[in-house]
Regions:
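Charged/polar, solvent-exposed surface patches and flexible loops
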Residues: 19, 43, 47, 84, ...
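Short basic/hydrophobic patches in alpha-helices and adjacent helix-turn junctions
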Residues: 67, 105, 116, 154-155
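Residue-level recognition of specific faces of alpha-helices
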Residues: 64, 95, 148-151
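Enrichment for repetitive, rod-forming helical segments
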Residues: 25, 32, 69, 107, ...
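Hydrophobic, well-ordered secondary-structure elements that form the walls
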Residues: 65, 103, 160
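C-terminal helix-coil-helix/basic helical segment that borders enzyme active sites and/or dimer interfaces
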Residues: 50, 59, 73-136
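Glycine-rich phosphate/cofactor-binding loops in nucleotide/flavin-utilizing enzymes
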Residues: 6, 11-31, 121-161
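Glycine-rich beta->alpha junctions and the first turn(s) of the following alpha-helix
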Residues: 1-75, 155
Length: 161
C-alpha cells in the first residue's frame, strides 16, 4: 500500500478498529431514539381506547412500559459509564457490546409493544406495499408501526457483530 494511503499510524489498526466499533455499537443501541419512541408510544396510548378506557391505563400495558422504562434507564446509565471511561482515556470496554445487544433487544421490544398497541391500524395502506385507493382512518404513526417492527428485526445482527 502506498504510504500516502495509510490512515493513522502503522500498526495501530486494531486500536482504531476498537474505537470505531465502540462508537458504532453505542450508536446502534440508540438510547435517545428509544427514549423518544417510548415517550411517543405512551402519548399515543392515551388516545387509543379499549373497553372505553385509554390503553395508557391498562395494567398490562403499563407493566410492559414500566419494564421497558427500567431497562432503558439501565441502558442509558451504561452508555454514560462507557462515555465517561472514554473521556478519562480508558479504552473501550465491554460496555459497547452490552449496549449493542441490550439496546437492539429493547428496540425490538418497543416496536413489538407499539405494534400491539396499534392493533389493526398498523396494517399498511398506500405506498408500494399497502392497499391502494383505500380510505385510511388510522394515524400516520400507526400505519408506520408495522414497517418499523419489521425493520427492527435486523438490528441484532448488523453493525459490530
Amino acid at each position: 500500500m502506498p504510504a500516502e494511503n495509510v490512515v493513522g499510524e502503522p500498526g495501530q489498526g486494531w486500536t482504531y478498529a476498537k474505537f470505531l466499533l465502540f462508537h458504532e455499537r453505542t450508536s446502534i443501541a440508540g438510547a435517545p431514539q428509544l427514549r423518544r419512541g417510548l415517550n411517543g408510544l405512551v402519548k399515543r396510548a392515551e388516545k387509543i381506547f379499549h373497553n372505553d378506557s385509554p390503553l395508557s391505563e391498562d395494567p398490562f400495558f403499563k407493566s410492559k412500559v414500566a419494564q421497558i422504562e427500567l431497562d432503558l434507564s439501565a441502558l442509558e446509565m451504561t452508555e454514560l459509564r462507557g462515555l465517561a471511561a472514554e473521556r478519562e482515556g480508558k479504552g473501550p470496554g465491554a460496555e459497547s457490546s452490552l449496549l449493542k445487544i441490550k439496546g437492539t433487544e429493547l428496540q425490538q421490544r418497543l416496536t413489538s409493544l407499539a405494534l400491539e398497541a396499534a392493533g389493526h391500524e398498523a396494517i399498511p395502506f398506500g405506498g408500494p406495499y399497502g392497499f391502494k385507493d383505500q380510505e385510511v382512518s388510522s394515524s400516520k404513526a400507526a400505519q408506520l408501526t408495522a414497517a418499523k417492527y419489521l425493520n427492527f428485526r435486523k438490528v441484532t445482527i448488523y453493525g459490530g457483530t
